[in-house]
Amino acid sequence: MKNEKWVVAIKMLPHKIYLKTLKGCLGMLLTAFLISHFSFLISSCARMGSPDGGWYDDDPPRVIGCSPEDKATNVTSKKITIYFDEFIKLADATQNVIVSPPQLEMPEIKTQGKRIVVNLIDTLKPNTTYTVDFSDAISDNNEGNPLGNYTYTFSTGEQIDTFEGAGYVLSADKLEPIQGISVGLYDDLADSAFRTKPMLRISRTDERGHFVIKGVAPGEYRVYALQDADGDFKFSQRSEMIAFSHQTYSPSCAPDTRQDTIWRDTLHIDNIVRVPYIHFYPDDVVLLAFQELQTTRNLLKIERVQPDRFTMFFTYGDSLLPVIRGLNFDSDSAFIVESNIKKDTITYWLRDTTLINQDTLRMDLTYQMTDTLGRLVEQTDSAIEVLAKTPYEKRMKQLKKDMEEWQKEQEKLKKKDEPYDSIYPVKPLEPKYNVSSSMDPHRSILIEMPTPLASLDTAAIHLYTKIDTLWYRASYDFGRKDSTLRYYELRADWQPSREYSLEIDSAAFIDIYGLVSKEYKQGIKVKSLDDYSTLVMQMIGMSDTSVVVQLLDKSENVVQQVKAESDGSASFYYINPGVYYVRAFMDRNGNGIWDTGLYDEDVQPEDVYYYNRSIECKAKWDNTLQWNLTEFKRYLQKPGELVKQKNSKSRKKQMNRNIDRAKRLGLEYVKDIKIKK
């Protein structure tokens, strides 16, 4: 009704005013209609698309220009500017950006919005190709999409050197990829060059241990790896990790094709195409990196954490023990000396309680030390003071406090008419028995004494075995383990599926301070042969040297170790069911342990090989496997499950964000992106 009156009122107006008013009203209605429908469309689009702002940007930044131009010749400027199509960031330029030839003065590398500026400090060398390898350090500022393997090149001469050489650096002992180690070329083929000259051209390994040296001129080269501690690009410190090879390389190239995978996303392949490219050689150099044995001998420190002993720590062992001359005590027969296998850690146990209670021991100490010429010489340190960490007075206060608390506890028991003690108990000797109720037939029982023994009564050690329902004495051997001071071993002919009982009388062990061991008893059940698996590795490609073969668990711990037979076989028995791996090394000196290399003596580390897959061992199974040690190149041998240095998947994670988001919206994310592996 109101609307009808409104229309009638308009019609009653004069003709011109009527037309003008009607036109204005229609315009207002049309405007309102368009606004409401536009708002509806916007809200509908928002509901159908992305309430959180659309697809993630997974495009890497693009280089749109350089100054000087990329691959420019006759360059004299030491300032380089690289321009991008968006704001970028540079991850840890010091570690990730490599300038070759190597720069003794660190270049200044920084980002400025959409550009990177590189200022070279060293004087430019004439007629030299320079490369600035950014690897994966460049990414866009917002989403972190990496540009990937970008290298800028220029030359101070008339031409650009374009050859490349590539390969892998692995740890010599475990074939683990070494990330971030420098790899360089020398055109001086003398062994001394690595010691006296900086590398000619340089690269750095990625997380796979892979390297590519770019901008190489024609010629003959030797390749080295160096964990450069002091930044001089040569082997100048014995602690530096290195790798060397006598093989020489002459770079070359040839036309080739490769398969490229075109991915719709990280899960679906769109197409596989063959792409022509220039293949540079060599592309499979393998360098085995190691650290030399540190034979420099110095005294690191002397500690007296416990009052009854003090320990000397050396950087390297020596067969000659230090000589101690006591200044405030009689050092004759004052100690029982214990050293580790390497003889770089030596513990002196004090025999006399008077010395134990003495807070300060002053002495002259004479020992073997390496001088500035690398020779072992006799060194005497005078008036050394060895201080107890906890002073005698403080120890006595603590002992008094403990006794008072014990007395209070006994008084409480006495008042309750419960059994109590009137004599403060003497602490017993407490050996550590490494034995459990279930035992493997090939194992022995280890016993660790907390202190050196004064006496040992083997007649107080009894081993019984159960046959049918009766117990009988079983024979055993008992003695020190590997000539150590405090570790003992009980060995017996353990019969599978049989029960045993280890019984040790009290006072079987008495230490140098008069502490006495308590009675000990442990039942033992030896496992059945049906619980185990047997594995025989039949090796091909062995050298004439002794070969040690190791059975490894998933954590690469050595489960068993055997020496290979002359026919190339290595047998492992009593294997508990599980997944295992096998490693072998060429034991050139026959000492049963892997030995590192020495550069000046031209000694390579002992060769290591991995069986390239896991081995499942099941109960009651006997496995025999053929193993050609050299069938696969070293960088392909170690099973991926054992490799600690994993490949980064950040690029694929960037793409997965869009895939995950598309799934949530019920859509399909399709984008042609090449991911080169």
Protein language model regions, located:
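Acidic, Ala/Val/Gly-enriched low-complexity intrinsically disordered segments
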Residues: 4-9, 32
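N-terminal targeting or signal-anchor segments and their processing/structural boundaries
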Residues: 8-26, 36-677
